[in-house]
């Protein structure tokens, strides 16, 4: 929950979230100002993503409380993890439930539309948006936008480690 890496990481996340609170801006507002998705801003501030040097000035402009030392820490590769109890948090539990419930159907559609492969969670964008449903009630839209990665046929003549050994 606190960005992994123990007590030091938890303290950094608390300081980052305090800087966000001082800004009085939502993740979406910060994202708009910095040119990032709202989920990526949250990932950065929770130390689940690495801040890139070219993005730092825009993020600092949006969140003035980010100190030089916090920005430097945000530029270090994070320890991506989660607390095992997080799955019991109701919003996260329901997201997991939705993926489990719809996952097999989504996988089948990916296979129909793209072939045998997966959606990347590395070359990946995610956002959360609020829209009004046909009934006028608020609805949550979670968008997963990941690069398609086809599974490889494991041909021995394409396996570089084997080709290197044969030519040595």
Swiss-Prot record:
Pfam families: Cyanate_lyase
Lineage: Eukaryota, Viridiplantae, Streptophyta, Embryophyta, Tracheophyta
Protein name, as recorded: Cyanate hydratase
NCBIfam families: cynS (TIGR00673)
Gene: CYN
Keyword Lyase belongs to the record: yes
Any Gene Ontology biological process: cyanate catabolic process
Keywords for the protein's UniProt record, in alphabetical order: Lyase
Residues annotated as catalytic: 94, 97, 120
Entry superkingdom: Eukaryota
Purpose: Catalyzes the reaction of cyanate with bicarbonate to produce ammonia and carbon dioxide.
An MF annotation (GO) of this entry: identical protein binding
Enzyme Commission numbers on file: 4.2.1.104
Family annotation (SMART domains): Cyanate_lyase
Family under the similarity heading: Belongs to the cyanase family.
Species for this entry: Oryza sativa subsp. indica
InterPro entries in the record: Cyanase, Cyanate_lyase_C, Cyanate_lyase_C_sf, Lambda_DNA-bd_dom_sf
Keyword Protease among record annotations: no
Catalytic activity: cyanate + hydrogencarbonate + 3 H(+) = NH4(+) + 2 CO2
């Amino acid at each position: 929950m606190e960005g992994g890496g123990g007590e030091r990481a938890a303290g950094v996340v608390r300081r980052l979230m305090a800087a966000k609170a001082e800004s009085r801006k939502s993740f979406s507002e910060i994202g708009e100002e910095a040119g990032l998705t709202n989920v990526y801003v949250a990932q950065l501030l929770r130390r689940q993503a690495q801040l890139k040097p070219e993005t730092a000035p825009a993020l600092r402009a949006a969140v003035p409380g980010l100190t030089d030392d916090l920005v430097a820490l945000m530029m270090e590769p994070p320890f991506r993890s989660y607390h095992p109890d997080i799955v019991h948090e109701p919003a996260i539990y329901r997201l997991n439930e939705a993926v489990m419930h719809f996952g097999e159907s989504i996988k089948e559609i990916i296979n129909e539309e793209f072939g045998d492969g997966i959606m990347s969670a590395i070359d990946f964008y995610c956002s959360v948006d609020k829209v009004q449903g046909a009934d006028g009630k608020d609805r949550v839209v979670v968008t997963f936008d990941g690069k398609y990665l086809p599974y490889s046929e494991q041909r021995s003549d394409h396996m570089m480690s084997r080709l290197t050994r044969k030519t040595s």
